[in-house]
A protein has these predicted regions:
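Juxtamembrane helix-loop boundary signature in multi-pass membrane transporters
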Residues: 1-14, 114-166, 177-180, 280-297
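Transmembrane alpha-helices of multi-pass small-molecule transport proteins
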Residues: 10-11, 36-88, 167-171, 190-206
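Loop-to-transmembrane-helix transition segments
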Residues: 10-18, 65-92, 156-164, 203, ...
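Hydrophobic/small/kink-forming positions within alpha-helical transmembrane segments
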Residues: 19-27, 54, 83-91, 113-118, ...
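Transmembrane alpha-helical segments that form core, pore/gating elements
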Residues: 27-30, 38-39, 53, 151-211, ...
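Specific alpha-helical transmembrane segments that line the substrate/conduction pathway
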Residues: 40-43, 47-48, 95-125, 242-259
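Helix-helix packing/entry segments at the starts of transmembrane helices
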Residues: 105-111, 178-194, 230-261
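C-terminal-most transmembrane helix of multi-pass membrane proteins
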Residues: 254-297
Length: 297
């Protein structure tokens, strides 16, 4: 993607769709977890996604042979590992939205690119530079401001927010390796299949709860937004470079904060925005440093 082919307005439209999807997913997740635990939620979310992906494959590939060719994974173990991390991260995210204010969770989730920078040397063989270490230190300072240890009680929700960011970072890095060999449709298909199995197995602990009709619409919402959010984000990245798209995603924080105030009477804390500002600055430095290196090469 270069400046001549970049379409920033279209990228912004796609990012608005992604932000709306992530926000709806959070609201639906809170509504569902009034009845179901996070494993049960993930089962229905993945099952809806599997239905959608199957329909897409049938429409696009038509023949059974073409579908089987499309979804045949080159490295099954890598798909399994990737989905274990993504499943853990997504469960922690849904758990976190029940424990801490939405704005705090999203601010902690924004540390994901920092974890990508730190873990990339281990997963994809990239160099760990002083710039990346400095960016990580700045990001962790932002985490401390958001969580405010010593000022407020640290909860399992704060830990869930940090760990979900690590899970999502591992997902990004492993997806990067998988995409060298397999298609997007293959990745999404196995994501929905494997995570349906994971969730169903774990949901049996303590007994599986069947959802009441009152939350069926929310289950549909969380299943559809799980796919639409990532599709919109991927589409935005095809319209403009990451350096243009990434700042747009950070609009999710004020949006989710206002939703928290409006629907759940959560407080708008200055510390959350100050800490998020440091995290976003760290991400911006990391993004532009990476972009500079690529242009230099």
């Amino acid at each position: 993607m270069n400046d001549e082919t970049s379409q920033p307005f279209l990228a912004a439209v796609w990012m608005l769709g992604a932000i709306a999807s992530f926000t709806l997913m959070a609201v639906a997740g809170r509504s569902i977890q009034a009845e179901l635990n996070s494993f049960e939620l993930m089962f229905w979310r993945s099952l809806v996604g599997l239905g959608v992906m199957t329909a897409v494959l049938v429409i696009l590939r038509r023949s059974a042979r073409a579908i089987l060719t499309e979804i045949r994974p080159t490295r099954p173990a890598l798909h399994l590992t990737r989905n274990l991390f993504h499943f853990a991260g997504q469960n922690l995210w849904f758990y976190g939205i029940m424990i801490i204010p939405l704005a705090q969770l999203v601010a902690l989730e924004f540390t994901m690119p920092i974890w990508v920078a730190l873990l990339a040397p281990l997963i994809v063989g990239e160099r760990l530079t002083w710039v990346r270490l400095s960016v990580a230190a700045l990001g962790f300072a932002g985490i401390l401001i958001v969580a405010q240890p010593g000022v407020q009680v640290l909860t399992s929700g704060h830990l869930a927010g940090i760990l979900c960011a690590i899970g999502f970072a591992m997902n990004i890095l492993l997806t990067k390796r998988i995409m060298r060999h397999d298609s997007v449709l293959c990745v999404l298909f196995w994501m929905t299949v494997l995570q349906t199995i994971f969730a169903l197995a774990l949901a049996q602990w303590g007994g599986f709860t069947w959802p009441s009709p009152a939350i069926w619409p929310w289950l549909l919402v969380v299943g559809l937004t799980g796919l639409s959010a990532h599709f919109a984000l991927s589409s935005a990245l095809t319209c403009a470079p990451a350096s243009t798209v990434a700042p747009m995603e950070f609009l999710r924080l004020p949006v989710i904060a206002l939703v928290g105030v409006w629907l759940y009477s959560e407080d708008l804390e200055i510390a959350v925005f100050l800490g998020a500002g440091l995290i976003l600055l760290a991400n911006w430095i990391n993004l532009n440093t990476t972009r500079y290196r690529r242009h230099k090469v």
